[in-house]
Each structure stands twice: as structure tokens, then as C-alpha cells.
């Protein structure tokens, strides 16, 4: 790989940092040696109605997996995110909303958000929603999505947020699995200038005869273009709140009462309903938000994630609002209407902390300096990356160009199932290496094990497991605890298996190498796809790459690389040879791709993750059953890749 050097902690950050290197060592030691004492103290970051006496009661034992934190305490999440801030910062902005159209933006104060949430909580009650009922939320990125989520939490209803890009079939599947009682949606969403037919998709989903639990659909008016309307079932948001009181006391919830269900794709294709509960989740979201982003009062924080993903739950809304932060919600995409939109939004709202995904960073990087044209970005202090491992070249570009070479990057590794950050730098405590998630957060005990579960000490590579529980951990899969145990605790007994591989370097830093099913075995050597992809993307003409293994009768697996070139570049036989030699030089002969497949589009989920399962099937010619493609942002990509594969000529 290209030489990785350490980025020291900038003096300007070190001076005011909440966590110093010494504090990190002290807290981390305490958190793993005496978790009850550590979390007993840290649990006070939020307000409890009835304080807890029991801190940790957890077991990873096969057949007895049980995760309980602060179990005798009671609280309300909405009261922690809203009510407790009113006296001190009621008039402070809670949410800055930036529309898809650059001319549309507004701010919502804590006082206003509290008013709107109480009002909508009463609407939910008037529609018969009770504590424990599940409410499906299928909304665009507007403040009302946050209002709906917080209103559910206020009355003890469980929300199941469905990303606004999912198809009617995917929506129906999630409504059926969770037994949702109500759907909250909008007439349409707007993204990159295009209308998203949310209400129409809900209408289509509700035609499924297996859905019997939905009595009403609440529709927020975003564009005014609602097509079909079913009287008696469909009700306008604005009509309902006219009648509603803004007085709604928060429901007292047990720490272990479910807060939300969030569906994540399973390897079998059937989505898994990950269940998070109230107390431990909020403690963990608030604490990780505060320390990982080194949040100081008044900082303007922008997480680009959609509310439909766990990042939108933990780090757009709940973590920031629990800490009384100012959080920016963005309806659009980072490159619309121009490729410098992300940079423009940073300047317009004087954003101090920016948290986005490698897929966005790589898309901007392909545009070069146009991505920062006419902008300064000098308000930025901290930047972050989430969603997948970020290759060192994209990390350095993000650091140098977007962050003006002065902002630490927190490259956070975590999952829907972990609730919050697991392995991550802390801005004032961690020297950075481009592409490394660095060290575990407090209370997180990672280990690397071989395929038999034997721990690998020191500098090593292996399966990434967590050996003990943390408060933000998911408790179960909705209605299927057996599948929860099977998926996460059966591969390596007594440990949580992340499904990811990682290596640990001489400094104890962790490098995520990708999903374990994305590890190639070439002539008996393990190669992480992330490493080969990083080498490919380091080539000056390559914008994006995805690597999969295909069977090879001598080497076991051959390396098949899908490659998207930068704008203006064309594939040639010469470039084919050049790229193969480039990887050979960067990593070694073993990692040389056997086949290059030029394409201008890769199959991505709506959260920007590349769907490698489909790429593997196309590469091996196994296209009879491509499985569930409903989560793809653009399903037509698959057909295009198949056509390209059929017409491919491999230079000799």
C-alpha cells in the first residue's frame, strides 16, 4: 500500500478537547476492568425518572443470550431530547433544515420542536396508538420525520422507520413483520430535483392482503401532489394537528422497553428487525456523540445520513438532541444542483462538525477541485466518516480538500446492531492513520479470532468479535430471538461476531478489511477486498472499484474487479494492463486482478453500500437467482452489468 503516516493531534484541538490521551487510557481501563462502576457513572449523562440501581446484567452464553442495562431505571427519551433543555436553551436552534432546493431552509428551536412533538404525540393517541404499538414511518428528510419519531418515543410507541427510497414490496414486508398499527408518510419526497412517490408506494404496499393491522395513514404535505386518497383511512397531518393540544406529559418507560425496530439486510435476503431499547441505547448514543465529535455547546453539527438508517437515528437525531446540540438535517444529495453543494452547505450554515460516508467522498473526489469551487469551509473543526471502510486515498482527499488539512477525521466503525460507535478515533486523544478506525470506544472489547475462534494476539488479522456487552447493543431481532443468537453468537461461542474482518497493527490500531464474506483466498493467502479496492482507487484515473472472488481451478479464487473511471477517462487495452500492474506494484503479485470489468455504475443500496452479493453472482455467471434486489437504489444497473459481462473481451 502507499505509505501511511500518522497525523498528530492538532494543537488547536488538543487545547479544548474533552478527552485527552491520558483521559482515554484512564477511562478505557476503568470501563473494561469495572464496567459497573464506569457505566454507573456515565449513565448520568441522561435524566432518569427512577434512577437505576442495577447497571449491567448480560450474557453471551449459547442458548442464554440476554442483554440488559440499567434495567430497574425508568426514563423517557423525548423528555431527554427536548424537555430537559427548555429552561436553558429553549430558544436555541435544535434542527437546521436545508432543503433539496438551495433556496429552502429553516430552523426549529428546542421550544418549537417540543411543542410540535407534544402536539403530534396527542394526534397519535387520538388515532388509537398506545404504549408498545409499532408505528411505521416512511418519510422524506423533513423536520416532521423527527417530530414523528420523537412523538412515538414520548408516548411509548415503538417506531419502525423505513428509508424513503425503499420499494412498495420492501415497505409491505416491514409492515407485516413488525405488525405496525399506523403508517406515517408524505405525499412525495424530493431528492436531487426529482419527486419520490412516497404516498403512492404506501398505497401499493397496503394492497398486500397480508397487511391487516393498518387502520390509518397519516400524510404530511411536502409537495401538494397526492394522487390516490382513501377516505376513512388517509388523513392529512395538517388537519390532525389543528385540533391537537400541545400538552402531552412524557410516558414513564422502563430502560428495557423497546424504543425502535430498524430493519437491516440479512445474508438470506429476509430483512432482520433489529430491536433497540430505551435506556442503554440513549446513554450510549449521547456519550459517543459527545466524545467522538468532541461536541462543545454552540457547535453546528451536520450528519448527512437519512433518518431511515441507524446513523440517522443515533447521530442525526437522538445523540445530538440528548446533548442539546444544533443538528443539521439535509433533504438533498451532496452533488446537487452542483458538485460543490456539500461545501456550499458547510459555508452557508457555518458547519463545525461534518459526518458523511465514503461513497459521497469518493463521488466528490472524482470531480476534483470542482467539489470545493467557490467555498472556504473554514468553519469546519472535526470531520467523520461512516458506512464502510474508507480507503486511504479518499481519506487524504477529504482531509486535505474538504477539511483544509486541519480537521481530525473520526473514521467510525459500528453497525445497526451496535447502536453506536465501537471503534473510532477521539479527536483530542488519537493520532490518526488514513483508513484506520484506530481504537475501541470506552467499554468496547474487540478481539481478533481465527476461523476456529482462537484469539490472535498482537499484530494480527482475523474475524472481528466483541467479547463483552455495551449499553447500545441491540437486544434481539423482532419476533426471532433464535435468529439473533444464530446470526451473532453461534459462530464464535460467547462472543458477538460482527461479520467483519480486521487487522491490528503494531500500534494496536484496527483496520477493517471488509465483510468476512468479502475476504478472498488466493493461492492460500487471505486478501481483504477493501485493501485491493484501496489500491485500485489510488490510481489517478479510477473513481470507484469493487472487488469479488470468482472460482479458479488453480488458485482457488481469482480476483474480479469492477472499475468506474473518472469523468472523461475511457477504457483502453493499455489502461487494462496499466491498472493490473499498478495493483501488482501497490500490494504484490498475489493481489493482481485477473479480470477488469469497466462499468459506469455499481449496484448500491440506498445507503450507498455496494451490494457485493450481486457482483459475485454476475462475475461467476450465476444469474439464475440474484436474490432480493429491492434495496438497490437503481435496479436497472444489474441488467447493464449483465450486458457488459456478455460483451466483455479480456485483453490477453
Curated annotation (Swiss-Prot):
GO terms for molecular function: acetate-CoA ligase activity; AMP binding; ATP binding; metal ion binding. Its cofactor is Mg(2+). PROSITE patterns: AMP_BINDING. It is an enzyme of class 6 (ligase). The keyword Signal does not apply. CoA binds at residues 191-194, 311, 335, 523, 584. GO terms for cellular component: cytosol. Its EC number is 6.2.1.1. ATP binds at residues 387-389, 411-416, 500, 515, 526. It comes from the Bacteria. Acetylated. Deacetylation by the SIR2-homolog deacetylase activates the enzyme. Mg(2+) binds at residues 537, 539, 542. Belongs to the ATP-dependent AMP-binding enzyme family. This is Acetyl-coenzyme A synthetase.
Amino acid at each position: 500500500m502507499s505509505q501511511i503516516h500518522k497525523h498528530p493531534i492538532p494543537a488547536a484541538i488538543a487545547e479544548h478537547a474533552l478527552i485527552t490521551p491520558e483521559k482515554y487510557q484512564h477511562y478505557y481501563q476503568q470501563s473494561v476492568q469495572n464496567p459497573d462502576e464506569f457505566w454507573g457513572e456515565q449513565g448520568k449523562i441522561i435524566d432518569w425518572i427512577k434512577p437505576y440501581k442495577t447497571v449491567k446484567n448480560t450474557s453471551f452464553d449459547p442458548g442464554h443470550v440476554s442483554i440488559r442495562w440499567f434495567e430497574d431505571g425508568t426514563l423517557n427519551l423525548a423528555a431527554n431530547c427536548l424537555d430537559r433543555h427548555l429552561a436553558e436553551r429553549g430558544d436555541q436552534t435544535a434542527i437546521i433544515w436545508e432543503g433539496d432546493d438551495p433556496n429552502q431552509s429553516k430552523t426549529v428551536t428546542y421550544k418549537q420542536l417540543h411543542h410540535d412533538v407534544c402536539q403530534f404525540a396527542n394526534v397519535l393517541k387520538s388515532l388509537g396508538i398506545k404504549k408498545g404499538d409499532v408505528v411505521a414511518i416512511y418519510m422524506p428528510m423533513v423536520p416532521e420525520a423527527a417530530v414523528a419519531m420523537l412523538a412515538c418515543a414520548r408516548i411509548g410507541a415503538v417506531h419502525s422507520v423505513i428509508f424513503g427510497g425503499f420499494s412498495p414490496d420492501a415497505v409491505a414486508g416491514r409492515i407485516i413483520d413488525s405488525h405496525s398499527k399506523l403508517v406515517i408518510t408524505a405525499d412525495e419526497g424530493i431528492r436531487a430535483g426529482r419527486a419520490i412517490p412516497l404516498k403512492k408506494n404506501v398505497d401499493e404496499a397496503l394492497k398486500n392482503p397480508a397487511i391487516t393491522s393498518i387502520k390509518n395513514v397519516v400524510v404530511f404535505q411536502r409537495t401538494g401532489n397526492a394522487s390516490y386518497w382513501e377516505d376513512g383511512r388517509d388523513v392529512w397531518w395538517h388537519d390532525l394537528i389543528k385540533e391537537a393540544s400541545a400538552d402531552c406529559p412524557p410516558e414513564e418507560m422502563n430502560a428495557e422497553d423497546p424504543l425502535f425496530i430498524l430493519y437491516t439486510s440479512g445474508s438470506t435476503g429476509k430483512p432482520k428487525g433489529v430491536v433497540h431499547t430505551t435506556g442503554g441505547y440513549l446513554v450510549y448514543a449521547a456519550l459517543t456523540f459527545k466524545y467522538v465529535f468532541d461536541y462543545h455547546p454552540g457547535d453546528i453539527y451536520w450528519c448527512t445520513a437519512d433518518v431511515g438508517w441507524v446513523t440517522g437515528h443515533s447521530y442525526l437525531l437522538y445523540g445530538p438532541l440528548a446533548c442539546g446540540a444544533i443538528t443539521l438535517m439535509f433533504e438533498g444529495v451532496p452533488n446537487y444542483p452542483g458538485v460543490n453543494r456539500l461545501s456550499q452547505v458547510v459555508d452557508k450554515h457555518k458547519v463545525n462538525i461534518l459526518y458523511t460516508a465514503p461513497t459521497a467522498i469518493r463521488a466528490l473526489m472524482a470531480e476534483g477541485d470542482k467539489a470545493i469551487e467557490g467555498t472556504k469551509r473554514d468553519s469546519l473543526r472535526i470531520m467523520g466518516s461512516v458506512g464502510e471502510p474508507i480507503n486511504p486515498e479518499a481519506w487524504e482527499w477529504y482531509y486535505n480538500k474538504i477539511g483544509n488539512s486541519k480537521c481530525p477525521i473520526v473514521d467510525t466503525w459500528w453497525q445497526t446492531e451496535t447502536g453506536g460507535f465501537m471503534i473510532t478515533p477521539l479527536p483530542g486523544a488519537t493520532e490518526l492513520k488514513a483508513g484506520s478506525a484506530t481504537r475501541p470506544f470506552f467499554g468496547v472489547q474487540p478481539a481478533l479470532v481465527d476461523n476456529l475462534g482462537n484469539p490472535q494476539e498482537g499484530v494480527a488479522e482475523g474475524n472481528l468479535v466483541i467479547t463483552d456487552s455495551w449499553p447500545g447493543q441491540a437486544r434481539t431481532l423482532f419476533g426471532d430471538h433464535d435468529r439473533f443468537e444464530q446470526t451473532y453468537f453461534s459462530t464464535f461461542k460467547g462472543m458477538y461476531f460482527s461479520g467483519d474482518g480486521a487487522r491490528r497493527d503494531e500500534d494496536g490500531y484496527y483496520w477493517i478489511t471488509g465483510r468476512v464474506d468479502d475476504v478472498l483466498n488466493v493461492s492460500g493467502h487471505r486478501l481483504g477486498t477493501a485493501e485491493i479496492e484501496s489500491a485500485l482507487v489510488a490510481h489517478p484515473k479510477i473513481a470507484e472499484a469493487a472487488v469479488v472472488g470468482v472460482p479458479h481451478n488453480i488458485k482457488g479464487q481469482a480476483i474480479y474487479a469492477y472499475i468506474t473511471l473518472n469523468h472523461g477517462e475511457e477504457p483502453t487495452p493499455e489502461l487494462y494492463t496499466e491498472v493490473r500492474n499498478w495493483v501488482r506494484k501497490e500490494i504484490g503479485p498475489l493481489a493482481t486482478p485477473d479480470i477488469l470489468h469497466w462499468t459506469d455504475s455499481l449496484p448500491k443500496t440506498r445507503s450507498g453500500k455496494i451490494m457485493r452479493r450481486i457482483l459475485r453472482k454476475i462475475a461467476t455467471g450465476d444469474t439464475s437467482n440474484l436474490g432480493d434486489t429491492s434495496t438497490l437504489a437503481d435496479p436497472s444497473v444489474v441488467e447493464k452489468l449483465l450486458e457488459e459481462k456478455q460483451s466483455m473481451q479480456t485483453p490477453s
